[in-house]
Amino acid sequence: MGDPGLAKLQFAPFNSALDVGFWHELTQKKLNEYRLDEAPKDIKGYYYNGDSAGLPTRLTLEFSAFDMSASTPAHCCPAMGTLHNTNTLEAFKTADKKLLLEQSANEIWEAIKSGAALENPMLLNKFLLLTFADLKKYHFYYWFCCPALCLPESIPLIRGPVSLDQRLSPKQIQALEHAYDDLCRAEGVTALPYFLFKYDDDTVLVSLLKHYSDFFQGQRTKITVGVYDPCNLAQYPGWPLRNFLVLAAHRWSGSFQSVEVLCFRDRTMQGARDVTHSIIFEVKLPEMAFSPDCPKAVGWEKNQKGGMGPRMVNLSGCMDPKRLAESSVDLNLKLMCWRLVPTLDLDKVVSVKCLLLGAGTLGCNVARTLMGWGVRHVTFVDNAKISYSNPVRQPLYEFEDCLGGGKPKALAAAERLQKIFPGVNARGFNMSIPMPGHPVNFSDVTMEQARRDVEQLEQLIDNHDVIFLLMDTRESRWLPTVIAASKRKLVINAALGFDTFVVMRHGLKKPKQQGAGDLCPSHLVAPADLGSSLFANIPGYKLGCYFCNDVVAPGDSTRDRTLDQQCTVSRPGLAVIAGALAVELMVSVLQHPEGGYAIASSSDDRMNEPPTSLGLVPHQIRGFLSRFDNVLPVSLAFDKCTACSPKVLDQYEREGFTFLAKVFNSSHSFLEDLTGLTLLHQETQAAEIWDMSDEETV
């Protein structure tokens, strides 16, 4: 037992100081790296001995706590810790805190017994952090622990704490500052957690703990040690001294009767360095033999109410609402990667730039689904205004948008996306797309406007990765199909009937530098390996576009049509289905290692191993709502296609707007003559005549 006549030494415990940046980094680590992994993780904090009077003894964790190689702030001491992050609140509550404390305390005890703590004194200052992060509400539950080994008896004070300037002269204090700074520089650090210290009237010397035998050679009664002390109380040392005294008692109690302790505190006020508020006192080392078993340990932090329990921090109210929305948008997506689709590459989806040509029923639904996938860059193109019939079918508009003649759809859609999620980069362009069979040569003004529209569309397609064709008419899809094919852009097309729809990806032409005989990666697969269908194993560069099945050129489809024929009349749920499938098709293509060149999946592949983590990558999805059925046909590119055939692309790339103007101002026969469709019609008619002649002969 300690001497009953002597006062007992008491310590100021650490207070955890977890920065908002730490919780943000934990959120990112949980979503992107840890996921369901509850294994302990190494983290790092620090404490400081220069705080102003009145501040608690703090151990700080910042955003850099997860980077073990990150530098510690200047003049701060690092503290190594272990993070135990649970997946559920129940697991957090039922975690065996006693076992966690015992495990950490045993590590400290082993470092003391082996002498490793003399070589690396940071091993004496370890901490635990038990956490649960509710990433939906941004509530973070945590319980902090800084394990301290307990001596079998309390530590008696031989001489009570006094300030350093009461024990040392100004000359000695200045010599101490210089000696400490020199030792730090020699070790390549700005702070040392513990050091040896001896002084007389003329000199002050300091050294590392591992040199204690040589440093205190010849001393038999008392030694002096320095402790980097984060506490600023005049009568009490900080928590780091506790484990050091256990080390001293274990290693030196047989050699020395007492230890003089300098709690080194070093702060700068108004540009002047001051260590005089450091305290120095003398304690009696317990004379006892330690058993090999780890001593009892304490260290769990009390909560705000002063009881033994965890703490909770609610960051939902203080975080930037835009950042909060951005993190929440990504939450469900990143949860997919935890267990369901670990190989999902979300960066490919989030970073893709999408151009939506058409901001009507399909455009609105496609945009909402793109946002659900976390796509941050969406651009609308449309020339229509919002009418009173639109808001019930087009979810980006409301009644007020129809007033005063209606807002431009493209601009209103972009504005609404930013209101839904401020993190999206949404733009709208109120412009027309010139079309075959719709003349633009009425005047120089209309001709010049068409030229500007074409240039604008070319620039938009050039600046985006995926082009969605979501317009009302067939001919309005022709120009973007030609431009996108020439620029080798992925095109996703969606079109509606009354109770049918088609969603397809256009074939992606080979890069221009490749010759006709060059092989894309998909072509290296042997046809017999993936099925027996006639259209099995068609690589992406051989797939057809929206116009490849046509044997006539596109023209003015609205001329001489009644109202029900001019408007898109379809079952209300059809656009939602087709819009969602269009986006899902894009995502599946992006997840395929060959992207737009991926071999097309067909209905025959439904029972085969899917080529991506998300499943099949079809060429087309044709749906029949009356039968609640979908089929996945595949079609080859047509060498006489009026949009993507080599003849059309060559003419466009050589002549540019001159060629396009001919298409706009001419009848459909111009494209048919160019591509060879006219000759095909003539040959077909001739064959029919010969067939009739043969029948008459018979």
From Swiss-Prot:
GO cellular component: axoneme; cytoplasm; cytosol; dopaminergic synapse; membrane; perinuclear region of cytoplasm; phagophore assembly site; presynapse
Disruption-associated phenotype: Leads to hepatomegaly in liver and accumulation of abnormal organelles in hepatic cells. Liver-specific knockout leads to loss of autophagy, increased accumulation of CRY1, decreased blood glucose levels due to impaired gluconeogenesis and the disruption of the circadian clock in the liver.
Covalent cross-link Glycyl lysine isopeptide (Lys-Gly) (interchain with G-Cter in ubiquitin), where: 41
Post-translational modification, as annotated: Acetylated by EP300. Polyubiquitinated on Lys-41 via 'Lys-63'-linked ubiquitin by TRIM32; this modification positiely regulates ATG8 and ATG12 activating enzyme activity leading to initiation of autophagy under metabolic stress.
The keyword Phosphoprotein is annotated on this UniProt entry: yes
CDD domains: Apg7
Subcellular location: Cytoplasm; Preautophagosomal structure
GO biological process: adult walking behavior; apoptotic process; autophagosome assembly; autophagy; autophagy of mitochondrion; cardiac muscle cell apoptotic process; cardiac muscle cell development; cellular response to hyperoxia
Keywords assigned: Acetylation, Autophagy, Biological rhythms, Cytoplasm, Isopeptide bond, Phosphoprotein, Protein transport, Transport, Ubl conjugation, Ubl conjugation pathway
Family as reported in the entry's similarity comment: Belongs to the ATG7 family.
Protein name: Ubiquitin-like modifier-activating enzyme ATG7
Highest classification ranks of the organism: Eukaryota, Metazoa, Chordata, Craniata, Vertebrata
